């Protein structure tokens, strides 16, 4: 046990954590040369393409240290993106130490700070590493100072390395062995294991990635999940060296996998505790929480007969992604589809891309919304995540919107622009701190505004230098109204938005003029209107196409021409009564592009 080291790597996107993991695996001989590929631990195509890590992965490596002993290192790769912060906290609570990898040319970023604080709160030993020191732009001195100023851990003796060219890999492994403590735990106590991650395999069912805290587990044991109370029989246990290798048992302090013939991912929840039925543990490990969806959007198949295929596809994705929630929904404009809940915008994009790529679906996605809390006149509190489900305004006492606390790290030159942006988005400044060349701004922002386009705007006002991290704070009452879009006098439910009253008129005008460009011209005039309740606040008309009915009249009496024109007018009127308007996919995306002024 004293020779086991469990550690994970904390880093911002693109600071080189997956490459570093590759080097460790290569150095310790976890895979043979022919099996090496770039980003071994990122198993999904979409992870490799976007260069991000979504699911946690592990590698059990053997390392012969300079003191001649062989150490068993368990590397747990964590996702770095803010949407997946719960997965990060699970991965970290399974470790005793974490490598804080910082790009020596870019310095500290917001998500690094957030994940690092999570690690420190969980009592994990943080070891700083400066990566990419072979870049001409690298400034290791400045960056180590930055780590000390911003995060407050000693970084003078931070290991300097370059994962790409393989410099300093051995130094990092030595530091891991010396600085990170060995796991504490009792191999003879009742079994306690933390589920770090779980995914679905077509052959064996659900595979659970676990960290054993106490006790041991071997095949044929009966295990029990403490959050759900479900019981299963263990079929096999083992470790990943990234390849899966079966073992006869897993003991306290180790990280490995358990397969127990489970059919549904819902029963193996990330962060839950596994124990034995015969000798159950007294209490579960702390920190388990149900993942809450933050962002909602409607997904509809373009062809309505694809509805069943879409449901199958979502169910299959859910096998691998327990944080995806969905329920059936009917829209008058779009037919049958699903209302889906996501962790954040990146998660929404990834799910959409996987549906299109892996399942070949054609989808229409409505604008993302957040959950609102409504206090009704009769004193009940309900949650609404779909604008078209909002009850009649006369019944509502107040609407509360979710507020998030966001931490923005930005270079000094761009502070003004970023503060202006936050104020436009109805943000309230909480704190501002200068640290070296960076400034850390803390704002309370309405989540509704962040979902729309805040992230893109933040990147463009700061030329890509600002980085953002956020967490949910509370629900707060606010003056919100529902903005409806009407085409030809009929409400299009899929285009409804909940907006702040001060932005409503501007938003309505923008949206309507965008829609006018996107709806194809018909044989009759189409009125596109934006309304709040019964008040129309903006209107545009899509002009009719018309045939020149006078082309065949040469000369002749004016009454003849009038008769033809009147006949055409009457025909157009009749068409307008029966005509319905096809709204193209782009119109639904137009909502996303409507920004606040």
UniProtKB/Swiss-Prot annotation:
SS bond list: none
Q: Chief subcellular site?
A: membrane
**Which cellular component, as a GO term, is one annotated location?**
plasma membrane
Q: Which GO terms describe its molecular function?
A: GTP binding; GTPase activity; guanosine tetraphosphate binding; ribosome binding; translation elongation factor activity
Pfam families from the xrefs? Answer: EFG_C, GTP_EFTU, GTP_EFTU_D2, LepA_C
EC identifiers of the protein:
3.6.5.n1
Please indicate if the UniProt record lists Cell membrane as a keyword: yes
Question: Which ranges carry the tr-type G domain?
Answer: 2-184
| Residues annotated as binding GTP | 14-19, 131-134
**Keywords (A to Z) from UniProt:** Cell inner membrane, Cell membrane, GTP-binding, Hydrolase, Membrane, Nucleotide-binding, Protein biosynthesis
Q: Which reaction does it catalyse?
A: GTP + H2O = GDP + phosphate + H(+)
A Gene Ontology biological process noted in the UniProt record is: positive regulation of translation
Localization recorded for this chain is:
Cell inner membrane
Q: How does it sit in the membrane?
A: Peripheral membrane protein
Listed InterPro entries: EF-4, EFG_III/V, EFG_V-like, EFTu-like_2, G_TR_CS, LepA_C_sf, LepA_CTD, LepA_IV
Please give the HAMAP family that the UniProt record associates with this protein.
LepA
Job description of the protein? Required for accurate and efficient protein synthesis under certain stress conditions. May act as a fidelity factor of the translation reaction, by catalyzing a one-codon backward translocation of tRNAs on improperly translocated ribosomes. Back-translocation proceeds from a post-translocation (POST) complex to a pre-translocation (PRE) complex, thus giving elongation factor G a second chance to translocate the tRNAs correctly. Binds to ribosomes in a GTP-dependent manner.
Q: Which family does it belong to?
A: Belongs to the TRAFAC class translation factor GTPase superfamily. Classic translation factor GTPase family. LepA subfamily.
Q: What is this protein called?
A: Elongation factor 4
Which organism encodes this protein? Laribacter hongkongensis (strain HLHK9)
Biological classification of the source:
Bacteria, Pseudomonadati, Pseudomonadota, Betaproteobacteria, Neisseriales
The gene it comes from is lepA
